[in-house]
Amino acid sequence: MTAVFAASDEMAMGAILAARDLGRRVPEDLSVVGVDGHDLGELVGLTTIAQDAYQQGFDAALLLLDMINGAPVPESLTYPTELVRRGSTAPLAPGA
């Protein structure tokens, strides 16, 4: 395994700690990417897919109220994301 794509930044930080416990170096031996853009990720140099969790939560609450009141709701919502490259990922090794 050369990379981990975690469902959250917290899980990604756990993967980094587990890799270190196993003697694996991040990013030399294992690249790690999280999702959220959590502030703690900046402290540990975590590459992340940043998203606006506050806006998503706000919109979810409004949608729930609309559903309770019988109002029509969209089938899906799409939010912008941004790849924030930090020190937990490395380029693909030649020949890999």
Residue ranges with predicted function:
Residues M1-G95:
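Flexible loop/turn connectors
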